[in-house]
Amino acid sequence: MSKKYFGTDGIRGRVGEYPITPDFMLKLGWAAGKAFRRQGICRVLVGKDTRISGYMFESVLEAGLSAAGADVLLLGPMPTPAIAYLTRTFHAEAGIVISASHNPHYDNGIKFFSGQGTKLPDELELVIEELLDNPMTVVDSAQLGKVSRINDAAGRYIEFCKSSVPTGTSFAGLKMVVDCAHGATYKVAPNVFRELGAEVAVLAAQPNGLNINDRCGSTDIVALQAEVLMQRADLGVAFDGDGDRVLMVDHTGAVVDGDELLFLIARDMHEHGKLQGGVVGTLMSNLGLELALQDMGIPFVRAKVGDRYVMAELLARNWQLGGEGSGHIVCCHHSTTGDGIIAALQVLRALKHRGQRLAEARQGMRKFPQVLVNVRYAGDKDPVGHPVVQEACERVTEQMAGRGRVLLRKSGTEPLVRVMVEGDDESQVRLHADNLAKIVSDVCA
């Protein structure tokens, strides 16, 4: 049975356009509360990022949950992985995040965590969707859920992040720039690194509700590159709006993406006998990551795109480490979801172990040129499965003769087809990607 509202990462869209409306979110809170309460009395944590619409949606979700008889604990602006962690530590039945992650302020969305801090199973999302079709009711007054605020959430999460590196770890002597994307990490990320001894300069940590991800953060890293060079810093760290992604910049201003960060963490864990099993990437992971891990004898498998699928593969194999080129990195031995701050700490620890700067340490992996072109489409078309598109992909694959790969997939959150071509010749890769994108666009017309 297919889902009507839930995509690969919850429900997301433009504020004011269905289903990202106050009336739908009220009903969603109620339906979720009904689903969570099937085991009896329940508590639900609710957190958000810094976009202005979060306050509106927090209020209606709170009302819907309470109407269903669920107690609500409000965390305020907090990173998505913090909500996953706090859901576990408060022994809540579920956690809810109000965020559109790396999207602009005019978008918003909702995603859920189970009581174990993992993404909700598909079956429970389907139950919530079924309940949305029912008329909304309110429990008796004596059974209404209570609502309260947690005032020490940031401090709890800071200590949790610091606990992901061994006691006594110090990054004294490290000069870094931290870009918080005017998002959910603005209160916590700089303090985590400072409390571990680093000298920290901070960018984009003055959220006003409208500037989240605006020319800052992991999706627009130009300002961080300039600041790292101006400050003569050792490196820069950029988070996205909700703190589940991280990218870095080395001292030369070069960007270090999620695949390279995953390699650095995996190599360090492997060299210190800490890596359990192998590494999970995605269909979009750079071929260079796979080959670098292969050279070290580290198994590598690809999951579907999306950190929930990376996590599912890790759990199925009882492995610890996985991630995506976008900077979603999951360290199962520390967290139950992608956590930008914790991933950054593991990279810093790896650099400390090797006594190298980021620019040197990244040389252990050779990235293959990879070109990604997004093609927007409308309606219920399936351009990926179109015979003309399939034939074109097969033709390009044959031309690359084992020196690269082609991947077309539909986005789980937007009406986009992502055309990815990867190979050892950058000019040919770009030519193939542009040609395939035009074919997809023509089919969609």
From Swiss-Prot:
Function: Catalyzes the conversion of glucosamine-6-phosphate to glucosamine-1-phosphate.
Keywords linked to the UniProt accession: Isomerase, Magnesium, Metal-binding, Phosphoprotein
GO CC list: cytosol
Organism of derivation: Azotobacter vinelandii (strain DJ / ATCC BAA-1303)
PANTHER family: PHOSPHOGLUCOMUTASE (ALPHA-D-GLUCOSE-1,6-BISPHOSPHATE-DEPENDENT), PHOSPHOHEXOSE MUTASE
Gene3D superfamilies: Alpha-D-Glucose-1,6-Bisphosphate, subunit A, domain 3, Alpha-D-phosphohexomutase, C-terminal domain
Keyword Metal-binding tagged: yes
Cofactor(s) of this protein: Mg(2+)
Residues recorded with modification Phosphoserine: S101
EC number: 5.4.2.10
PTM comment: Activated by phosphorylation.
Catalyzed reactions: alpha-D-glucosamine 1-phosphate = D-glucosamine 6-phosphate
SUPFAM superfamilies: Phosphoglucomutase, C-terminal domain, Phosphoglucomutase, first 3 domains
GO MF terms held by the record: magnesium ion binding; phosphoglucosamine mutase activity; phosphomannomutase activity
Xref: Pfam families: PGM_PMM_I, PGM_PMM_II, PGM_PMM_III, PGM_PMM_IV
Cell membrane as UniProt keyword: no
Binding site for Mg(2+): S101, D240, D242, D244
BP-aspect Gene Ontology terms: carbohydrate metabolic process; peptidoglycan biosynthetic process; UDP-N-acetylglucosamine biosynthetic process
Protein name: Phosphoglucosamine mutase
